[in-house]
Amino acid sequence: MYKDKNNVVEDSFQAFLVDGANFTKNEEYPIIESWMIPKLPPKKIMPFDKALNYHGDLSDVYICTYARDCTFERIRKNPKRYLNFFKRCAGIIGFDYSIHSDMPIVKQKAQMNDNLSLSFYYGKQENNIIPNIRYGIDELADEYLS
């Protein structure tokens, strides 16, 4: 176990993403709370990679990650770095790291967990979150949607 100079254990698994979360019963996916979800639909939507280079006002724009994973992998690697960016936006459509039905189930579950963990984290930071409903094989649907 690695501790820094302040004797704090390094959070290499990014447990901070789900700090304060409630979890589903079996797989313990973090639950996106109802107060994180906006009442009104988005007026505008822009992909993350386009929004990063956009020099205009993003205050009425929801950011989505419907693109190749490599265009937004940087968020998963360093979520704190993008806090200020997402604060400039109207909200986030839940993350969409790829889940394919031919992936090993453990990898599907890991991707589902990352999608929900990041969505929860940014929701807790008072960003509006529109949950992204994405699961792999049908057998995973009940737990994911609980």
Task: Cite the ranges covered by each PLM segment.
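Non-catalytic, usually N-terminal nucleic-acid engagement modules in DNA/RNA processing proteins
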Residues: 2-86, 93-95, 103-104
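Eukaryote-skewed repeat-based solenoidal scaffolds used as protein-protein interaction platforms
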Residues: 72-146
